[in-house]
Amino acid sequence: MTDDNYLKRKHMKTSRGIRNNNPLNIRRSADNWQGAREEQTDQSFVQFKSMAYGYRAAWKVLQTYYDRFCMQGKPFTVRNIISRWAPPDENDTEAYIRRVLKLSSIGGKENLLPPDNVDGYERLSGLLQAMTCIECGISPQEVDTEAICRGYRLAFPENNEELDKWLQAKDEYWNW
């Protein structure tokens, strides 16, 4: 027999980003996100059908940032990404940057590869994992890294074969 009160308490403690399948808490806008729930009951944040679609949106946001930064002559770094994502008028941007750098092990001035480049997958998936920890208030072990990968596949389906090869090579390296 299930304790309904326990389930209600557990659900109430779950972060908004997890409940919405929106791990980076992407705000509602005029964008018509692939995988968005038909009925949007949260007035502020997009609600997705699955966590994979939430991460698909996150990958697409990163790609948009990359494209904009290139057009503006800015490097694609954690500092520039987070400064755009969590501007100082609404956030403690410097604390957010420090936390992401610590959780992701990405260098502060490291110029990252574009999101649609499989060679940059490991670094950027680490970035998304760190941002999820901050946005959802969870530990790195609680982040659904499989959903990050599925989101990448949904965002960049043309790279699925190359990603499979990369993942297989990484798996073989760690399991020799």
Indicate where each model-derived feature is located:
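Cell-wall polysaccharide-cleaving catalytic domain and substrate-binding groove, primarily
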Residues: 1-176
